[in-house]
């Protein structure tokens, strides 16, 4: 990555049904990478990259990170895991802040909290967090959900569309609040 030594990555997860979840419950994750973000939610900064996908619960499938069920929590943890994997492929990044609306996922990922559920996925995400921390300064910050924060809303859009198995709207046609 050229020109960016400080990045903000917004992560989110989405789930079709968050009660009685199973391995077949649809869930999706998304993240967007922002350079020059002020953190105030007004959309400052440039979108450098974005990724999204479905939560993989089949332990034999490519992309499985340890999730056993599709849920909002496994989607949030998956978003962080994929963001960390992306960070590990980038050169020149000195500082990265992972911003998300799930305090649970941020604190599990960074090791502040111990996982009581989703242990396999939590262990994988914690391992990625530790590995990433060896290469750059990494921290997590909580942002309020569904409060019009542009980049958090974009991550929500990406996750929701992945869960629905639909393509996200291109940034130029998307507005905060659009799912």
Show where each model-derived region lies.
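Acidic/proline-rich low-complexity IDRs
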Residues: 6, 46-47, 135-137, 170
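Loop-to-helix element that buttresses phosphate recognition and phosphoryl-transfer chemistry
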Residues: 75, 79
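RNase H catalytic domain
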Residues: 15-20, 62-66, 80-160, 171-172
């Amino acid at each position: 990555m050229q020109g960016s030594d400080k990045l903000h990555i917004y992560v989110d997860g989405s789930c079709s049904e968050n009660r009685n979840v199973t391995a077949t419950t649809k869930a999706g994750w998304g993240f967007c990478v922002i350079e020059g973000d002020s953190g105030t939610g007004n959309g400052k900064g440039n979108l450098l990259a974005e990724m999204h996908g479905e939560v993989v619960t089949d332990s034999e499938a490519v992309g499985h990170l340890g999730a056993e069920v599709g849920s909002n929590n496994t989607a949030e943890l998956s978003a962080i895991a994929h963001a960390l994997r992306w960070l590990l492929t980038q050169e020149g990044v000195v500082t990265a802040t992972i911003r998300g609306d799930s305090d649970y996922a941020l604190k599990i990922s960074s090791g502040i909290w111990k996982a009581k559920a989703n242990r396999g996925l939590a262990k994988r995400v914690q391992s990625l967090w530790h590995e990433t921390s060896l290469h750059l300064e990494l921290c997590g910050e909580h942002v309020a959900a569904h409060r019009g924060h542009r980049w958090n809303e974009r991550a929500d859009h990406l996750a929701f569309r992945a869960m629905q198995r639909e393509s996200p709207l291109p940034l130029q046609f998307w507005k905060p609040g659009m799912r």
